[in-house]
């Protein structure tokens, strides 16, 4: 993190440090030689964009209801089971228009949580974009698409087809207080891991825009203490909850958000609780 006119800013370090980050933030304003720009030690570090780019560009979370009736892949040319860049696939469903670009998504696991009353809730279904395609033919409810790009995965039957939109990737994030977020919150998924997060990891939290969360919000992560036996009395004890790190939200959805682990003294477990974190001004 760097400071500009007394305000903390976060951006991608492209090898030129805070001077370059601020120059890009100000639209090319050249810093005067006497201006002193320095990183904030022991504060929020610059986030390398490559750590979160995949989730910014190719991941989304939608309600299962919103996916009802959307087109899906039913096959590929030459009876292929999988398809990649430059190949042709067929989709079934209404709404595909010839000449338009589409994103092809693999469905992940839904976010199922238990609320305070013990009832299970579905907070959304995670979708990962595996390819981009353009519709080249259409007849009734069957469309032919040509895959123009693929992203580290093949296209398979059953994958969803949704409109593709150009997204401007943010290069700066502003760390801000999370005081107005609906109380509670926890880590409900660790991306790319079976359940432990560390520094530079991406996690999903069960708070989204309906709870007041915005990109840039910083939370402290508090981990419940272990259950142990008293060595003298053999009583079952729970060690105190400890603050173990900080995360910053970088992409929000209705009921969940993606966050980047800024720092972590211990591995973060699923269920680790969130609390507002104070951002140094």
Where are these regions (language model features)?
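Surface-exposed, polar/charged interaction patches used for macromolecular assembly or partner binding
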Residues: 1-281
